[in-house]
């Protein structure tokens, strides 16, 4: 998959992957100087990956698709929180997390969905802050589903802030 917004993925067979940014104000290029600070709604890129086809209309954390997951399906969202909060507080951990079945639970979903399970990890990579949100179609089948999710996560590539600045990209 081509690198879009500094996010790319080489998914295992059977995964659908999309990178998008909602309409809104694009943040300044990494390293750009801003003359006057103005409060604006800034949108950031989101990478979605799923073992089933995804509807075009879906939320950043998978609303519109996680409800459709079958018992063997997996959904992954990599949500960019920007450079301003990277490497500190909630985003202090470095690098993509390793997924394990023990990290998943039905109570980790944004709202209750019978039978499903999720995990959520906050981290930084290359001066950028992220949330990795993963939903399994069946909590009971997490021992089989988590390795599939982990295989996808291993193929994620995040372009660091400095490289984006050199290339004139927008995180």
Residues covered by each model-derived region:
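Glycine-rich loops and low-complexity Gly/Arg-rich segments
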Residues: 24-27, 33-36, 102, 147, ...
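Residues that flank catalytic or metal-binding motifs in active/ligand-binding sites
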Residues: 11, 119, 152
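Secretory pathway targeting signatures of secreted, lumenal, and periplasmic proteins
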Residues: 1-87
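Signature of long, low-cysteine stretches enriched in small and polar/charged residues
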Residues: 56-127, 135-136, 140
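Surface-exposed amphipathic alpha-helical segments
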Residues: 15, 131-171
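Short, isolated positions in well-ordered beta-strands
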Residues: 7-9, 98, 130
């Amino acid at each position: 998959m081509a690198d879009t917004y500094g996010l790319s993925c080489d998914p295992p067979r059977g995964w659908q992957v999309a990178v998008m940014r909602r309409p809104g104000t694009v943040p300044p290029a990494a390293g750009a100087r801003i003359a006057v600070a103005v409060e604006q709604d800034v949108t950031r890129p989101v990478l979605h990956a799923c073992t089933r086809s995804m509807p075009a209309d879906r939320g950043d954390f998978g609303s519109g698709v996680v409800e459709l997951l079958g018992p063997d399906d997996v959904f992954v969202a990599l949500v960019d929180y920007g450079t301003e909060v990277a490497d500190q507080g909630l985003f202090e951990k470095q690098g993509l997390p390793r997924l394990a079945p023990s990290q998943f639970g039905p109570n980790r979903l944004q709202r209750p969905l019978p039978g499903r399970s999720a995990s959520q990890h906050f981290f930084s990579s290359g001066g950028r802050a992220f949330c990795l949100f993963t939903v399994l179609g069946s909590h009971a089948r997490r021992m089989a589903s988590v390795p599939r999710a982990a295989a996808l996560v291993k193929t994620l590539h995040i372009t660091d802030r400095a490289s984006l600045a050199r290339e004139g990209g927008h995180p």
